[in-house]
């Protein structure tokens, strides 16, 4: 997913969600936390979203606890009650955009049977990146699944010296490897 699409998603989640009237809720004059402005509703069949959202959840643990409580109460909703509670998405926009991905230096060893080994300083991409899945009525749900991937890379030749049939002669074997210079969170290809 492109950064522009992610920004659009975050803008939608930050106050442009519809209220019970179907119109976007007007911005309140007092400042509020990002989480308090991002509401979603668990709707039963034929239920309308409530006009007043519940207060913000503080953590994933509270969110998951609410999910369990809602699963226990699903029998009531299926028996005809239209009562639905608002659920706050516990998303921090900085956590969604920013991942912990970096290039970690290591010494890579290249060798082949009968050849002398060569050591080359390289980098590997290591860290965690955010992922997101938003279900909806659209057959293609919004999915963001980032991986820690090379941002700057180049191919470099590596020369190995290998022995031939006689111990006195050697030949060059040229191979190439990718040298990683930097990493970032990027959608999986």
From Swiss-Prot:
Induction remarks: Down-regulation during the establishment of embryonic left-right axis could be due to translation repression, involving BICC1 and possibly DICER1, and/or transcript degradation, involving BICC1 and the CCR4-NOT complex. Attenuated DAND5 expression lifts repression of NODAL and defines leftness by induction of the left lateral plate mesoderm NODAL signaling cascade.
GO-annotated molecular function: morphogen activity
Tissue specificity comment: Expressed in the retina, in inner segments of photoreceptors, at or close to the outer plexiform layer and in the ganglion cell layer (at protein level).
Pfam families: DAN
Keywords from the UniProt entry: Disulfide bond, Glycoprotein, Heterotaxy, Secreted, Signal
Top-level division of the source organism's lineage: Eukaryota
GO cellular component: extracellular region; extracellular space
Keyword Signal on entry: yes
Residues in the signal sequence: 1-22
Protein's UniProt keywords contain Transmembrane: no
Coiled coil stretches, renumbered: none
GO biological process, one term: negative regulation of BMP signaling pathway
Localization, UniProt: Secreted
Disulfide cysteine pairs (residue numbers): 101-148, 115-162, 125-183, 129-185
Record-annotated CTCK domain positions: 101-186
Glycosylation sites: 38
Gene3D superfamilies: Cystine-knot cytokines
Function: Antagonist of the extracellular signaling protein NODAL, which is required for correct left-right patterning during embryonic development. Antagonist of BMP and TGF-beta signaling. Independently of its role in left-right axis establishment, plays a role during heart development, possibly through the regulation of TGF-beta/Nodal signaling pathway. Displays anti-angiogenic activity by inhibiting endothelial sprouting, migration, and proliferation. Once internalized by endothelial cells, may alter their redox and glycolytic balance.
Protein family per UniProt: Belongs to the DAN family.
Disease per record: Heterotaxy, visceral, 13, autosomal: A form of visceral heterotaxy, a complex disorder due to disruption of the normal left-right asymmetry of the thoracoabdominal organs. Visceral heterotaxy or situs ambiguus results in randomization of the placement of visceral organs, including the heart, lungs, liver, spleen, and stomach. The organs are oriented randomly with respect to the left-right axis and with respect to one another. It can be associated with a variety of congenital defects including cardiac malformations. HTX13 inheritance is autosomal recessive.
Protein name: DAN domain family member 5
Organism of derivation: Homo sapiens
């Amino acid at each position: 997913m492109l950064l522009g699409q992610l920004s659009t998603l975050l803008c939608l989640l930050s106050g442009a969600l519809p209220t019970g009237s179907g119109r976007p809720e007007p911005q309140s004059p007092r400042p509020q936390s990002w989480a308090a402005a991002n509401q979603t509703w668990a709707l039963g069949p034929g239920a309308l979203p409530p006009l007043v959202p519940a207060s913000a959840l503080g953590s994933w643990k509270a969110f998951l606890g609410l999910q369990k409580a809602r699963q226990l109460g699903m029998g009531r909703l299926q028996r005809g009650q239209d009562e639905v509670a608002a659920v706050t998405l516990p998303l921090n926009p900085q956590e969604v955009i920013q991942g912990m991905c970096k290039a970690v230096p290591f010494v890579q060893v290249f060798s082949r049977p009968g050849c002398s080994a060569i050591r080359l300083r390289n980098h590997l991409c290591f860290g965690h990146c955010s992922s997101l899945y938003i279900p909806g009525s659209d057959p293609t749900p919004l999915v963001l699944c980032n991986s820690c991937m090379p941002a700057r890379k180049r191919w470099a030749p590596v020369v190995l010296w290998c022995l031939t049939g006689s111990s006195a002669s050697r030949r060059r074997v040229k191979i190439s490897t990718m040298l990683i210079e930097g990493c970032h969170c990027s959608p999986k290809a």
